[in-house]
């Protein structure tokens, strides 16, 4: 579904309801904070989307929460189950240690969801991945059991870098670069350069 700059690159409840009614999808995939825009849905926006999803009980909900601990400017992270606990039986949360703990490329992730889904994914996964390398497993254990200040410290560093990049991008004549609220992406509008090369 299109999520233009005029909507802060976010899906509205009205858009979702119209698409759900028309297409009746089996799965709705939601990314918050957003990749590639870095926009973060507010509690009210998540609640409005959750209200819509309650109306469509035959649709699974997969939430890509990989950047949920990378939120800036004092904003919070909100999800559908917090808003509507009755969605719990059809929400699958996907998360990763890669971004939160600075382990990109090591591909250590996990999911939380209904037991039936977890069992099916375990079977599927066992046929595709033989094991996780021992060093990656050790790093994942250290990340999860070690000091949990790492994500907070990284967020401060990423927020400072974001502010520098945004200032530099917006100093370029004609470039408009909205301030991302999470993740580590910037999504500049460089349409001022279209047709000039």
Residue ranges and their predicted role:
Residues 1-197:
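PLP-dependent class I/II
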